[in-house]
């Protein structure tokens, strides 16, 4: 996963931060080694960016993977990243998540945290619950938000089965970033849809 190239021109308005390889590996390990939610499954990666989670799911034996992002440039890089590690079976889709339809065994996502556009993470979580039987969704860690996310999940017919606390270390991505790497505390939610 270290070889997956980051976005060459990330857009601040879309909160495009390439998920660090270590964090992606941890999420994928939890999803497959602990819960068995990737191998032989259909997987959607919402807001896939340059494809790190999608590619990881395919490498771990997902039967069918769809990576979705609104940014055509990110999808082009994702497709090249997949090819560079010998993965050709991923369907890369340029789309707003609101237009997506279908059913997947598992949805994995590192959505925008809603820093630039309030509620962006909520839209991703609602769509993931609509599409997936099991959802892995990464959110900025905030004790006050945990109750809100749990209620939102339940309102949309899901249940939080596990909460994993993690740290991500983000390299400087935009001009206003001054730290060599920034630690971000995040929560990974495992959600089961009741639909």
Show which residues each predicted segment covers.
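S-adenosyl-L-methionine
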Residues: 1-44, 55, 76-103
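Conserved glycine-centered beta->alpha loop in an early N-terminal alpha/beta scaffold
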Residues: 47
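Conserved SAM-binding loop of SAM-dependent methyltransferases across substrates and taxa
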Residues: 50-62
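Conserved SAM-binding motif I beta-strand of class I
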Residues: 64-69
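Short alpha-helix immediately C-terminal to the canonical SAM-binding loop
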Residues: 75-76, 146
């Amino acid at each position: 996963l270290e070889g997956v190239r980051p976005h060459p021109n990330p857009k601040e308005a879309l909160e495009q931060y390439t998920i660090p390889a270590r964090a992606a590996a941890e999420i994928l390990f939890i999803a497959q080694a602990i819960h068995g939610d990737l191998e032989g499954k259909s997987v959607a990666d919402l807001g896939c960016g340059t494809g790190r989670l999608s590619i990881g799911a395919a490498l771990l034996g997902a039967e069918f993977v769809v990576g979705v992002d609104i940014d055509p440039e990110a999808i082009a890089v994702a497709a090249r990243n997949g090819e560079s590690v010998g993965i050709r079976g991923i369907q890369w889709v340029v789309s707003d998540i609101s237009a997506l339809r279908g059913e997947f065994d598992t949805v994995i996502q590192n959505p925008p945290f809603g820093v630039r556009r309030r509620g962006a993470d909520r839209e991703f979580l609602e769509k993931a619950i609509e599409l997936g039987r099991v959802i892995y969704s990464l959110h900025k860690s905030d004790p006050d938000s945990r109750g809100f996310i749990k209620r939102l999940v339940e309102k949309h017919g899901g249940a939080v089965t596990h909460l994993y606390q993690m740290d991500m270390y983000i390299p400087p991505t935009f001009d206003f970033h001054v730290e060599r790497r920034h630690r971000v505390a995040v929560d990974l939610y495992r959600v089961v849809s009741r639909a």
